[in-house]
Amino acid sequence: MTAAVTPTPRLAHGGRLDAARRRFPDAPTPWIDLSTGVNPQPYPAPDWPITALTRLPDDDAFATLEMAARLAYRAPSEIQVVCGAGVQAFIQLLPHVFPARRVAILGFSYAEYAASWRNAGAEVMTVETLDELVDADVAVIVNPNNPDGRLASAQELTALARRMAQRGGLLAIDESFMDFTPQHSVVDLTAQAGVIVLRSFGKAY
């Protein structure tokens, strides 16, 4: 006996120049892609040995990566660093690691947080002020914000984290673009319970 399998819809994301070229075949070239935050001029890759591509990373390789992230982001020694396949992967995992009934997102912002928590059955609210985040089980702020660069101060986020902790809530701070203004990072806030900070190698490197 067999059962039909419904395929999971492909995640819509930026950077689909192939689709844009098909839709607008007469557009001038080269295209300037503003739909994704990936650096179009990355640092030159070193001459890696081919053996680096023939096996999965072992524990030592993960430890090296975590140490590199800790040093790059000035993460305190007492906090846990978790590496993954990009911030997008964590966005999709968060609703399952931190189930929530009500999620508040400081908007207008990156839409994948709302989509992921809605898919997990949460009520998602887009709010306009930091004060409105406090009433939710999970509060999400992209800082600096994508796409407009809005930036909440360390003082504001510290106060918000304290208020969320008093309610037993989770504050998720997405610092994917913080490499461009690193002095505003609040990665040290993760030393307290109920705060996670997401960082991205791909935006700057």
Specify the residue positions occupied by each region the protein language model found.
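Active-site pre-Tyr helix/loop in NAD(P)-dependent dehydrogenases
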Residues: G37, F201-A204
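N-terminal "arm"/small-domain region of PLP-dependent enzymes with the aminotransferase-like
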Residues: M1-A61, A68
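Conserved A-loop
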Residues: Q41, F180, Y205
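Conserved core of the PLP fold type I
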Residues: L53-A165, A172, F177-G202
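Residue-level marker for buried hydrophobic side chains located in beta-strands
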Residues: L34, L171-A172
